[in-house]
From Swiss-Prot:
It comes from Apis mellifera (Honeybee). Residues 33-52 form a propeptide. Keywords: Antibiotic, Antimicrobial, Disulfide bond, Fungicide, Hemostasis impairing toxin, Immunity, Innate immunity, Protease inhibitor, Secreted, Serine protease inhibitor, Signal, Toxin. It comes from the Eukaryota. InterPro entries: Secapin. Residues 1-32 form the signal peptide. GO terms for cellular component: extracellular region. One of its GO terms (molecular function) is toxin activity. Serine protease inhibitor which exhibits antifibrinolytic, antielastolytic and antimicrobial activities. Displays antimicrobial activity against bacteria and fungi. Likely functions in the innate immune response to microbial infection and possibly in the venom, as an antifibrinolytic agent. Not toxic to mice but does induce slight sedation at higher doses (from 40 mg/kg). At a dose of 80 mg/kg, sedation occurs 15 minutes after injection and is accompanied by piloerection and hypothermia. One of its GO terms (biological process) is venom-mediated perturbation of biological process. Disulfide bonds join 61-72. Belongs to the secapin family. Expressed by the venom gland. This is Secapin.
Amino acid sequence: MKNYSKNATHLITVLLFSFVVILLIIPSKCEAVSNDMQPLEARSADLVPEPRYIIDVPPRCPPGSKFIKNRCRVIVP
């Protein structure tokens, strides 16, 4: 009879432990799913800060050319 009660106690302990683990895991999974359901713009806005100051720097052209009308043009002498 002792053996059965020991097995039952062990079984109840394992079941309670697994129940507690499930209760801890399920809310975090639900939160991850709700974050995935948000639009991409809403998620990326939280992650990437917008640059405050945008400085317009003209691109550098190779020697012998100039930046004309948004392109590097070769100057022919």
